[in-house]
Regions:
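Non-catalytic, structured segments within soluble enzyme domains
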Residues: 1-13, 20, 24, 156-157, ...
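Conserved structured core elements
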Residues: 4, 16, 20, 57, ...
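Second-shell loop/turn segments in exported
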Residues: 7-13, 63-71, 113-118, 126, ...
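Conserved catalytic neighborhood of penicillin-recognizing serine enzymes
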Residues: 90-151, 166, 194, 206-236
Length: 354
């Protein structure tokens, strides 16, 4: 209370242009008057929050969905799973048979996840394709191969305690908000360096004395090579060459520069998280009362929002994609067969350690 009468100056990390971009996207894309959206823009490496909206109209609802609405995150959980896979010997060309599958679990129950529209390849698919089309069978096979506890433990590292280690966790049955989701993704986007997201840079009194100054943690929480290899894999979402039995999830959107992206959907929510070394954006759309999404237009709000932010960043900044470390080897592969193809798609493979 001693500071209350000192005329405090609060310096935030927010960028008015990014804030405006999020507000415009919310206004332009949410056609249904009752559908809600929340979005956040973050600067990788520093973890500064550059923009944040908790709903589409603050005058009608002050509830901050970005930080307080805990919803199932769907397939946006999968990059965390595939980070663990890369840590445990998987590569972009690791394959699993893709067909309708009933899994027998350790407690003698069964689990039968399905793909979108019940579409399957009915053959082996590789990790890159599984990411591009957001394949559920590949995700659950990976999850059970690694052990259900591994993914739960990784999520808990980010301070999310209420995580149930079960088979469906691989498909995003975790309830959290997009602030926490962005916090996890930003660690991958920052080459494994963890800094908690923040909005206040410093606070001074009317004499200019600093009362509070943000301090970075700069903790190397995740493996740098695995994060870089994963970021390269997440570019597959935009690549129409993967659109076979299912569409690559972001193939409808053409961007000038290279970006990583993962989408997610449940019956009641649609999400997208995208990033490059300059910016990360996460967006959610849905109804507050958990009604099913009605129109295909509303289901694309999150995708369009992240694309708007990526395009704005590309127009106003010199965006350069990540570079592989000396431990990673760039290899071009045919997207479907996984064979070497000099005209194929380049992914980063971990070199075998001698």
């Amino acid at each position: 209370n001693t500071y209350l009468n000192q005329g405090l100056n609060v310096y935030t990390t927010l960028d008015s242009d990014y804030q405006k971009a999020l507000e415009q996207s919310a206004t332009n894309y949410t056609k249904d008057s009752e559908v809600e959206t929340s979005s956040i823009v973050v600067e990788p490496y520093t973890s500064k929050v550059l923009g944040l909206i908790g709903g589409k109209d603050y005058s009608k609802s002050q509830f901050n969905r970005a930080t307080k609405a805990n919803r199932q995150i769907g397939s946006t959980i999968k990059p965390l799973l595939y980070y663990l896979a890369l840590e445990n010997g998987f590569s972009p060309t690791t394959t699993f048979l893709n067909e309708p599958t009933t899994f027998k679990l350790e407690d003698n129950t069964t689990y039968s996840p399905g793909n979108f529209n019940d579409k399957y390849a009915y053959k082996e698919i590789n990790l890159a394709q599984a990411i591009a089309v957001s394949d559920n069978i590949y995700a659950v096979k990976t999850h059970l191969f690694l052990g259900e506890e591994n993914l739960a433990s990784l999520i808990k590292k980010f301070g999310i305690e209420d995580v149930e280690a079960n088979a469906s966790l691989a498909l995003g049955t975790l309830n959290t908000n997009i602030y926490n989701l962005a916090n996890m993704y930003n660690t991958i986007a920052s080459e494994g360096i963890y800094n908690h997201l923040y909005t206040i840079e410093k606070i001074t009194n009317n004499e200019g004395k600093i009362i509070y100054q943000h301090k970075a943690q700069n903790e190397q929480m995740l493996n740098k090579d695995s994060c870089l290899a994963l970021s390269q894999l997440l570019t597959a979402s935009f690549d129409s060459r993967y659109s076979t039995y299912l569409q690559a999830t972001m193939a409808a959107y053409k961007l000038e520069n290279t970006n990583a992206c993962k989408t997610g959907s449940t019956d009641f929510d649609n999400l997208a998280v995208a990033y490059n070394p300059n910016v990360l954006v996460a967006s959610w759309v849905g109804y507050d009362d958990n009604r099913k999404m009605k129109t295909s237009n509303d289901k694309t709000v999150a995708k369009k929002t992240v694309v708007d932010v990526l395009n704005y960043t590309n127009e106003t900044q010199d965006v350069k994609w990540y570079k592989p470390t000396k431990n990673l080897q760039a290899i071009a592969i045919d997207p479907i067969s996984s064979e070497f193809d000099e005209n194929g798609i380049v992914y980063w493979f971990k070199k075998k350690q001698s």
